[in-house]
Amino acid sequence: MQGSVTEFLKPRLVDIEQVNSTRAKVTLEPLERGFGHTLGNALRRILLSSMPGCAVTEVEIDGVLHEYSSKEGVQEDILEILLNLKGLAVTIEGKDEALLTLSKSGTGPVTAADITHDGDVTIVNPDHVICHLTGNNDISMRIRVERGRGYVPASARAQTEDDDRPIGRLLVDASFSPVARIAYNVEAARVEQRTDLDKLVIDMTTNGTIDPEEAIRRSATILAEQLDAFVELRDVTEQAVVEEKPEFDPILLRPVDDLELTVRSANCLKAEAIHYIGDLVQRTEVELLKTPNLGKKSLTEIKDVLASRGLSLGMRLENWPPASLADDL
């Protein structure tokens, strides 16, 4: 395979092996040597930490005041119930949070299928066991599910909660990422005579709320959007060069009529071809006094008007007049 030494091979999606509904293997090749680990590690970190999803954040169980207790007639203690609730795979459409309710009595397992919710909520794993009832007892709880990203421990949210949080409202460590497991492997690849290439194999398992292939696509989009800032560095620099300060103060480009001088003074300046304020400030007092019909009274008027605008006579302006005015003169 012949090509420029500065050209990089572009990977292509070679194979998507759907192991089951929640697990898939994605293979990309060929990659330049070293790019397998570079891309694999970046995608892995994004998939684990930056994928948006839904998770249980708060739980209220009737008759329970804190998580270090137990409930009569329930086989599991409260901490184990909270751990099981973290395993719910939920999606929410059209809003950022939802309140679910669970109420069941009798004997046997309590599963996610026993949860009551509105049409905007979908529970992907209805067979997920939450707890077991014994001795014909009952349990009721309210479960808050929120949309988020990454991992947010309960302790972090507790610090931002108000002190008037009701007793019995239990905060849950929230893992919002829909990716349950992600691993990658870099193997050797060959294209024609080149044998020093990489093949990236990504093995991923989700909680069922997102298709593995879609998760890969979203993570790659997130990475590309973040890298766009580096691609635009040159454009930002060029734009900054273009946006330089104007060569002259805009007031110097205005006609002398804007100074609202007396008719006598204005006519004297026009007779001397002084059309713009920039023309005027370059003249000295001696030069103006040589102007026919312009006396000391008019000179004083001109000096006062210029001073009120932060200007004075005898100023030196390099490259005057600018091209835009020179064309009009």
From Swiss-Prot:
Domain characteristics, as noted in the entry: The N-terminal domain is essential for RNAP assembly and basal transcription, whereas the C-terminal domain is involved in interaction with transcriptional regulators and with upstream promoter elements.
Enzyme class name: transferase
GO biological process: DNA-templated transcription
A GO cellular component annotation in the UniProt record: cytoplasm
Record-linked HAMAP family: RNApol_bact_RpoA
Region Alpha N-terminal domain (alpha-NTD): start-end pairs: 1-234
GO molecular function, one term: protein dimerization activity
Keywords, in A-Z order: DNA-directed RNA polymerase, Nucleotidyltransferase, Transcription, Transferase
Gene3D superfamilies (alphabetical): 5' to 3' exonuclease, C-terminal subdomain, DNA-directed RNA polymerase, insert domain, RNA polymerase, RBP11-like subunit
Gene name for this UniProt entry: rpoA
Signal peptide from the UniProt entry: none
EC number of this enzyme: 2.7.7.6
Subunit-level organization: Homodimer. The RNAP catalytic core consists of 2 alpha, 1 beta, 1 beta' and 1 omega subunit. When a sigma factor is associated with the core the holoenzyme is formed, which can initiate transcription.
Pfam families: RNA_pol_A_bac (PF01000), RNA_pol_A_CTD (PF03118), RNA_pol_L (PF01193)
Similarity annotation: Belongs to the RNA polymerase alpha chain family.
Task of the protein: DNA-dependent RNA polymerase catalyzes the transcription of DNA into RNA using the four ribonucleoside triphosphates as substrates.
Catalytic activity: RNA(n) + a ribonucleoside 5'-triphosphate = RNA(n+1) + diphosphate
UniProt protein name: DNA-directed RNA polymerase subunit alpha
Record region (Alpha C-terminal domain (alpha-CTD)): 248-329
